[in-house]
Amino acid sequence: METKVQVEFGGRTITIETGKMAKQASGAVVVSSGDTMVLVTAVATKTAKEGQDFFPLTVNYQEKAYAGGKIPGGFFKREARPSDNETLTCRLIDRPIRPLFPENFLNDTQIMATVVSADKDNDPGILSMVGASAALMVSDIPFQGPIAGVKVGRVDGRFIANPTADEMEKSDIEIVVAASKDAVIMVEGSAAEVSEEDMLEAIFFGHAAIQPLLAAQEELCSKAGVAKREVPPPAVNEELKANVKDIAYARMKEAVRIKSKVERHNSIDAISAETLAALATEFEGCDKQIKAFLGDFEYELVREHILKDGERIDGRDTKTIRQITTEVSLLPRAHGSALFTRGETQSLVAATLGTSIDEQRIDSLFGESKKRFLLHYNFPPFSVGETSFRLGPGRREIGHGMLAERALARVLPKHDDFPYTIRIVSDILESNGSSSMASVCGGSMSMMDAGIPIKAPVAGIAMGLIKEGEDFAILSDILGDEDHLGDMDFKVAGTAEGVTALQMDIKIGGVTREIMGIALKQALEGRLHILGRMADTIKTSKSDLSTYAPRITTIYVKTDKIRDVIGSGGKNIRGITEATGVTIDIDDTGKINIASTDKAACDLAIKMIRDLTAEAEEGKLYMGLVKKVMEFGAFVEIFPGTDGLVHISELDTERVKNVTDILKEGDKVLVKCIGIDKQGKIKLSRKEALGATLPE
C-alpha cells in the first residue's frame, strides 16, 4: 500500500513516500522536493555470516544522468565509477546512521540512494540522508533512528535551512548537520573565518530545523512500518572472560600506557599471542572471543585512566598538543613544499601552480564546471607500517582531501588577483591520528612557501571525547588509538580569526551543546598554539614565486579585437604560442592571461598581441614594412594585418616621379599617421617623418 507524508521545510515541501517503488527491499522510500527525487532502499541479510565480528554496512549513492536530462559521456554511454561528489555524499549518508545500529547486529546491510530527478535548488544529497533514515525506519532492520540532515547557510546574518544555489553564493557558512531528536550526530562543512560561537549557533539552528523531518518519519513509520527483527544479546562466556582477565588484565594496564605507538602495539600484540597460547588447549576454537575480551579490556583501561586520572595514553593531559616540527622549501623543484610533523603523524605537502589549462573540468547533472583549487590527500600503507594493494584513492582519502581543501579554500586570493590553478598534494608519511589536519597545516605552509598570497595561515586540530554516563573528557590532538577507543572525532580548522572547516563524527547516540561548545573552545586554544609553531618557520607568503612556477601576466583588449588575436582558425594565437612557448588564455571579456616561466618570452608574446590589436593614432610615428608598391604610392604595414597608404605626394619633400625611386617592397620605413577616414583607411606620410626618430 502506498503511504505518503509531507512536511513544509525551509519554505519548500518535502515528500516521503513508501510502498510504490522497490517493494522487495527491506525498506524503500522516495524523497522529493521540487523537481528533485531520490529513491533510497535499505536491505539487510537474514543472518550474519559465520564468524562475522564487525558490522558490514555499505552505502551507495548514484546520480543517474537522466535525472538531469543528460546522456553520459564516454565510449560506453552509461554511468561509470562514482564521482568525487558521489563518494562524498556516500560518506554523508553513512556517518550519521552507522552509530545507530545495535552493537551486536552484524548482518550485511546495504543502503542505496539513487537520484532519479534533480533540479538545482533541492540538494539530492540532503534528501538522501533523510531517505536513508526513513527507509530503515519502515523496514524490519533494527535501527535506533530516526535522524535527518540539513544544509545550513547564513546570508546577511540570517541562518537559512537548505539554502538555494543562489543563496549559497552569498553565504559565509556552508555546513551539513545530521541529528536525532535529542542530539547532534554529525557535522561537516566550511565557513569564512566564522567565530566558534557562530558555528555553534549554526549547528543548533540546523538541529532545531530538522525536527519536522523527524516527526514526518515517525508518522510514516507508524503508518507503514513493520516490526523490527529481534537482535539477541551476545552470549558471553564468563569463564573464558575470567581466565583472559587473570592472564592479561594487569599486563594490559601497563601496555596501554606505553607512549610509543609501535612499542605499545607490539606489547599488546605480545599479550594477545601469549594469552591465546595459554588458553589454546582449554578453550580451543575461541580465538575470536579471546581477542574480543582483550579489546574490551584495552577500551576499558584507556578510558578509565583518562576519566579518573586525566592522563592519556602517551602521558599528556587532555589539552596538551604533541611536539610539532616544521620545515619548508625542502623539495627543490616543487613550487612550494612543507614537511609538517606532529607527534607520530607526518605530512609531506607540495604546492604546484598552473594555468587555466590545468583547471579540473567537472561534469555534473547540471552541466560542466571548472575547479581551480585542488587538494589531493594520499594515505599510503607504509604510513602505518602495513602493506596493501592500491587501486587509486579510496573513500576515506577523498573525504579527508575534501575536508582539507575546504579548510584552505576560504583563504585563497581572488582569481582576478591571482589567476593560477593551484594543486596541493599531501602525502602522509606517518600516521598516528589527525593526518587530515596535518594536511591542512602543511598545505597552508606549502602555499605560503609557493608565494600564494593567502589571507592568513590555517591550522587544524582533531578533538576527541571520552564519555561514561555524565562524566566526560574532551581531548585535544587525539592519537589514532584515542580515535579508535573514544566516542568522537571532531576536526576543526581555521585561522586565528575564525573557523574555516569542521567535521564531527561520533560513535554514541549524539553530543550535547555543552560538549560541542567546550570542544570548539578547546580546539581554538589548540589551533592558536599550532599556528604559533607554524609561524616559527614561515609567517606570511613569500613575495616571489618559485623560479620554476609559471608567471601569469594579464592584459586586456577590446572585445572586438579578440578575433584579431585568435585569427582565422586560431592561426594568430597558435603562431604566438609556437614562436614564444607561452600559454595563452582568452575569455570573452577581452581578458588575456599569458603564462610562461621565461619573462622574455612573455614580453614578446605581449608585444605580438599588442601589435595584432593596436590601432593607428593620428600624429603618431610608426616603423612600417612596405607590403606593396603602386604607381600612386605604397601600402605600408604598421601592425600585423594593418596597412596604410603613403601617397606618392607624401613620400618626400621633393617631387617624386616613381614610387620605386624611394621605396621597394620589403623596405622598412618610418612613417607618420596623418589621418584616418570614416571608412577606417589610414593615411601615412614618409615626408612628415623625415628627420624624426621613434621614441624609446
Curated annotation (Swiss-Prot):
Binding site for Mg(2+): D483, D489
InterPro entries: ExoRNase_PH_dom1 (IPR001247), ExoRNase_PH_dom2 (IPR015847), ExoRNase_PH_dom2_sf (IPR036345), KH_dom (IPR004087), KH_dom_type_1 (IPR004088), KH_dom_type_1_sf (IPR036612), NA-bd_OB-fold (IPR012340), PNPase (IPR012162)
GO cellular component: cytosol
Cofactor or coenzyme needed: Mg(2+)
Listed GO biological process terms: mRNA catabolic process; RNA processing
Subcellular location: Cytoplasm
Domain S1 motif: 619-687
Keywords attached to this entry: Cytoplasm, Magnesium, Metal-binding, Nucleotidyltransferase, RNA-binding, Transferase
Keyword RNA-binding found: yes
Main location class: cytoplasm
UniProt superkingdom: Bacteria
Protein's UniProt keywords contain Phosphoprotein: no
EC number: 2.7.7.8
Gene3D superfamilies per UniProt: GHMP Kinase, N-terminal domain, K Homology domain, type 1, Nucleic acid-binding proteins
Residue ranges occupied by any KH domain in the UniProt entry: 550-609
Single Gene Ontology MF annotation: 3'-5'-RNA exonuclease activity
Reaction(s) this enzyme catalyzes, per UniProt: RNA(n+1) + phosphate = RNA(n) + a ribonucleoside 5'-diphosphate
Entry function: Involved in mRNA degradation. Catalyzes the phosphorolysis of single-stranded polyribonucleotides processively in the 3'- to 5'-direction.
Family: Belongs to the polyribonucleotide nucleotidyltransferase family.
Name of this chain's protein: Polyribonucleotide nucleotidyltransferase
Biological source species: Geotalea uraniireducens (strain Rf4)
Gene: pnp
